[in-house]
């Protein structure tokens, strides 16, 4: 598991919403007055209770929804919601939804992963290169010819992510990617995400798992009724006031850090444990 990146000065915003608001049909605003940025190289965990607007936010960032007011920017430039503008956005930002069956529709794994690159009008050679690269990144090269309906749930998840990776996005947004996976499947997926990050992809993960967020992310964004609060993960997830408003509990690692410091076993300047292995190492 990679170490959280240490911020010096704010990384540039790859994609950002400024003053954005959105409501479904005639309903109340789901999000309003929203300022939110995905910064290059920062692993970002998006957390909040059901109905807090996480899915809406992800779809706004990826161009699936258009804010009623406000602006979506890509590299500092406003996104145009025409074919050219959305193609530019979707080659930079890719969203993978929670249920892989909502994204898989081709007969085989290889065909499904090739769909996006083919739609870009790339040559057959370039499509094959991208598909092979994406399958290898998700460790499913051996499944290229397998019918998608014969895949396990974990394999379907990986295939859906591979389809996004084949677009070579700079930002990959994942909605509950570890949901429904067994512990081994979760570990394998997290290792894959570490590999994508090492290759230069900025990853955003929506999750309800505060312990996973503490372990994996550099920054955490909490959706509360008052808006989105974003900051370095350990400090943000230690804010019991924010956690309460976001409908979340204190991560065990944060609780353990507080206990260790209270007993003089961990210096205030030292980083607290994010995993059971890190806690065990402190005890040695």
Curated annotation (Swiss-Prot):
Residues the entry annotates as binding ATP: 48-55
Any one of the GO BP annotations: cobalt ion transport
Residue ranges annotated for the ABC transporter domain, each copy included: 15-250
Location, primary (coarse class): membrane
Top-tier EC class: translocase
Function (record text): Probably part of an ABC transporter complex. Responsible for energy coupling to the transport system.
Annotated protein name in UniProt: Putative ABC transporter ATP-binding protein SCO5958
Species whose genome carries this gene: Streptomyces coelicolor (strain ATCC BAA-471 / A3(2) / M145)
């Amino acid at each position: 598991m990679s170490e959280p990146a240490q911020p010096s000065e704010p990384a540039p915003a790859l994609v950002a919403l400024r003053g954005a608001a959105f409501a479904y049909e005639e309903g109340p605003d789901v999000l309003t007055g929203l300022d939110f940025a995905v910064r290059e190289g920062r692993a970002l965990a998006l957390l909040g209770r059901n109905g807090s607007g996480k899915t809406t936010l992800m779809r706004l960032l990826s161009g699936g929804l258009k804010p009623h007011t406000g602006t979506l920017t890509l590299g500092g430039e406003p996104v145009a919601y025409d074919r050219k503008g959305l193609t530019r956005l979707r080659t930079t930002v890719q969203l993978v939804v929670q249920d892989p069956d909502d994204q898989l529709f081709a007969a085989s794994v290889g065909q499904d992963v090739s769909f996006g690159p083919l739609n870009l009008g790339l040559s057959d050679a370039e499509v094959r290169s991208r598909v092979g690269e994406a399958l290898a990144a998700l460790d499913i090269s051996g499944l290229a010819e397998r019918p998608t309906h014969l895949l396990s749930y974990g394999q379907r998840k990986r295939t859906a992510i591979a389809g996004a990776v084949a677009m070579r996005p700079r930002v990959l947004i994942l909605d509950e990617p570890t949901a429904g996976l067994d512990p081994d499947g979760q570990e394998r997926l997290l290792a894959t995400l570490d590999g994508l990050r090492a290759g230069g992809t900025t990853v955003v993960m929506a999750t309800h798992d505060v312990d996973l967020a503490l372990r994996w992310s550099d920054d955490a964004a909490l959706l509360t009724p008052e808006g989105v609060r974003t900051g370095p993960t350990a400090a943000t997830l230690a804010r019991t006031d924010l956690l309460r408003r976001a409908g979340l509990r204190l991560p065990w690692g944060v609780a353990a850090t507080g206990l260790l410091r209270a007993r003089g076993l961990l210096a205030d300047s030292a980083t607290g444990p994010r995993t059971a292995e890190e806690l065990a190492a402190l005890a040695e």
